[in-house]
Amino acid sequence: MLEHIERDGGTIAVDVSGTGPLVVLAHGMGDSRHSYRFLVPELVAAGYRVANVDIRGCGDSSAGWAGYSRTDIAEDLVAVVRHLGGPAVVVGQSISGGAATIAAADAPDVITGVVELAPFTRAQSFDLGGFLRNQNHHRSGTVQLLRVMAAGSLPGWLAYLDLAVPTKPSDWAAERSRIEDALRRPGRMAVLQAMTKTTPADAGARLADVRCPVLVVQGGADPDWADPAAEGRRILADLPTGLGDLAVIDGAGHYPHTETPAEVLALVLPFLGRTLTATTTGGDRA
């Protein structure tokens, strides 16, 4: 069931399905809740109530927000959890991985776990050596993202996606067309450009404040980093000792939940069982 939650003069669209403990899904920039099309039915079948969110400015959520930072998105996610009734585990990809971190730090009473998929969760340093060495992958992806950041280039974003999804799902041609059509809607490319200009430093500053378990999943072929596994280890190092776990999926890029959904589910379902089911006492809301 699609709901619209009022937030600061805008609306956040949330598609809720299933019954059971609450799992909130938040996609990355330039995308929509359709990004989780392979995970939602499996999570529902496993006995979870799934709230699949269109983050601000994307999908069926409104555009024209004053800000698109991870802190802004985190406030929306906490509002979703409180509206639906927690506790919840929040799954966030890319920019929403950082937002999920902030949400967990801000609302430990209702967020009991975080899954970060290919997350931008800490301030980035430019790896010149990796940039020069990895010319066919990391370097190419960075160049396309710079086109989006500097000029709001839709062709640049589509070229980036072709690199960022090295393991193409069977519906990739249709999915790529869907994304392109969505970004041609008025104001949507401006939202994407604004998101590329945000810094993950706000999320990195809150890693030490997180008190719930965190699972970081990196794609080994993610073009956003010269060494994706090293980025994951840095996130864990900034969390309180013992809270974080890292998994790297070989061959996956920046969208492991669409490229390798079975592998992601094999990691996420046990995590949910440990961090959510045992703490949930009821309160399902259809």
Report residues per predicted region.
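N-terminal cap/lid segment of alpha/beta-hydrolase-fold proteins
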Residues: 1-11
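Conserved HGGG/HGGXW glycine-rich cap/lid loop of the alpha/beta-hydrolase fold
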Residues: 13-60
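Short N-terminal helix/helix-N-cap motif within the alpha/beta-hydrolase-1
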Residues: 33-41, 60-63, 98-99, 125, ...
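Active-site loop/oxyanion-hole signature of alpha/beta-hydrolase fold enzymes
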Residues: 45, 52-91, 95, 121, ...
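Flexible "cap/lid" loop of the alpha/beta hydrolase fold
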Residues: 101, 105, 112-149
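Conserved alpha/beta-hydrolase catalytic His-Asp/Glu region
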Residues: 125-126, 148-208
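Conserved loop-alpha-helix segment in the C-terminal half of the alpha/beta-hydrolase fold
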Residues: 211-252
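Catalytic active-site module of serine/aspartate enzymes centered on a nucleophile-bearing elbow/loop
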Residues: 240-286
